[in-house]
């Protein structure tokens, strides 16, 4: 079974990784002058 601590750690890791993906994508999209739509 999954305990509360394991679930909390999994949720935190998922949230942090998604947040970092969004920040990384924003950084790449802003600093890419080749792709002007």
Curated annotation (Swiss-Prot):
GO CC field: endoplasmic reticulum membrane; oligosaccharyltransferase complex; oligosaccharyltransferase complex A; oligosaccharyltransferase complex B
Family annotation (Pfam families): Ost4
Signal peptide: none
Membrane side Lumenal: residue ranges: 1-4
Pathway(s) the chain acts in: Protein modification; protein glycosylation
Key words of the record: Endoplasmic reticulum, Membrane, Signal-anchor, Transmembrane, Transmembrane helix
Residue numbers on the Cytoplasmic membrane side: 26-37
Main localization of the protein described in the UniProt heading: endoplasmic reticulum
TM region positions: 5-25
Membrane topology recorded in Swiss-Prot or TrEMBL: Single-pass type III membrane protein
Effect of residue 23 to K: Decreases interaction with STT3A, STT3B and RPN1
Protein origin, superkingdom: Eukaryota
Annotated localization: Endoplasmic reticulum; Endoplasmic reticulum membrane
GO BP, sorted A to Z: protein N-linked glycosylation; protein N-linked glycosylation via asparagine
S-S bonds: none
Oligomeric and partner information: Component of the oligosaccharyltransferase (OST) complex. OST exists in two different complex forms which contain common core subunits RPN1, RPN2, OST48, OST4, DAD1 and TMEM258, either STT3A or STT3B as catalytic subunits, and form-specific accessory subunits. STT3A complex assembly occurs through the formation of 3 subcomplexes. Subcomplex 1 contains RPN1 and TMEM258, subcomplex 2 contains the STT3A-specific subunits STT3A, DC2/OSTC, and KCP2 as well as the core subunit OST4, and subcomplex 3 contains RPN2, DAD1, and OST48.
Similarity comment: family membership: Belongs to the OST4 family.
Function text: Subunit of the oligosaccharyl transferase (OST) complex that catalyzes the initial transfer of a defined glycan (Glc(3)Man(9)GlcNAc(2) in eukaryotes) from the lipid carrier dolichol-pyrophosphate to an asparagine residue within an Asn-X-Ser/Thr consensus motif in nascent polypeptide chains, the first step in protein N-glycosylation. N-glycosylation occurs cotranslationally and the complex associates with the Sec61 complex at the channel-forming translocon complex that mediates protein translocation across the endoplasmic reticulum (ER). All subunits are required for a maximal enzyme activity.
Protein name per its UniProtKB record: Dolichyl-diphosphooligosaccharide--protein glycosyltransferase subunit 4
Source organism per UniProt: Homo sapiens
């Amino acid at each position: 079974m999954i305990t509360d601590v394991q679930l909390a750690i999994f949720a935190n890791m998922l949230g942090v990784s998604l947040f970092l993906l969004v920040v990384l994508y924003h950084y790449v999209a802003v600093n890419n002058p080749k792709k002007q739509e």
